Amino acid sequence: MSQISRDEVAHLARLARLALTETELDSFAGQLDAILTHVSQIQAVDVTGVQATDNPLKDVNVTRPDETVPCLTQRQVLDQAPDAVDGRFAVPQILGDEQ
């Protein structure tokens, strides 16, 4: 038995202000019915004794700690660039003026 009718899909489409063709209504009714069937199967799973969790992973922070290390200054980097203007790399324009 279908869990959602074609008329219910048409009603939902009207509420969402979607103009659906007859073919689309039939197609979406079938797709939504399949989705609802899958949801029903998941809801039927016995989870008695299973503790609820929002994240099954126990890893809290797997990144390295931040460390300040010496690096090049802005001037040292820009001195190696082919062209720099106002403390920034100068590169050829790739987009037109209309952008």
Swiss-Prot record:
Enzyme Commission number(s) of this protein: 6.3.5.-
UniProt key word Coiled coil: no
Pfam families per record: GatC (PF02686)
Keywords for the protein's UniProt record, in alphabetical order: ATP-binding, Ligase, Nucleotide-binding, Protein biosynthesis
Membrane-traversing stretches: none
Role summary: Allows the formation of correctly charged Asn-tRNA(Asn) or Gln-tRNA(Gln) through the transamidation of misacylated Asp-tRNA(Asn) or Glu-tRNA(Gln) in organisms which lack either or both of asparaginyl-tRNA or glutaminyl-tRNA synthetases. The reaction takes place in the presence of glutamine and ATP through an activated phospho-Asp-tRNA(Asn) or phospho-Glu-tRNA(Gln).
Similarity comment: Belongs to the GatC family.
Official protein name in the record: Glutamyl-tRNA(Gln) amidotransferase subunit C
Classification of source organism: Bacteria, Bacillati, Actinomycetota, Actinomycetes, Mycobacteriales
